[in-house]
Amino acid sequence: TYVPNYFDILPMYMVILVMMPLMVALSRVSVWAVFAVMAAIWLFAQRSALDSLGMIDLHLGFPAEPWSDRKWFFNPFGWQLVFFTGFALMRGWIPKPPVNKALIALALVIVLANVPLSHIGMREFGFDWARDWRIANSGLLNKSDFGILRYVHFLSLAYLCWAAAGD
């Protein structure tokens, strides 16, 4: 599974595409089965959560190359959550989100609240408290394993784009 440093986004897509027949087959049983498997795979890709539960041996991830313990920069088992969320929306397994002011406001608050927590917020605006918060809560923002706050941020940003584009 050799992958040069940080070049594993294309192999990540290949792993996710290999998972596609499983998800489509599960959808014939129940879309809830798809969502349960998506969530379980994502959960077992969360290194920090498993570590805190003493279950790190169950972590789903590939080594970047056979001779080291370096992990993939984009763990496909974490990132499949965003891929299959989009797939579920396109297949109609998840209904189109309604466009309303309350959801737009909530999504905007989430996106703006992430600015201080971003590297730009820390570097350009001097939000030093955010650095401490990020260190203490690194699993929530983990890019490699696709932490839950990244997912919430993605959903919020995607919703704002959906609302702006219209039906």
What are these regions (language model features)?
Residues 1-167:
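Alpha-helical transmembrane segments and their immediate juxtamembrane cytosolic regions
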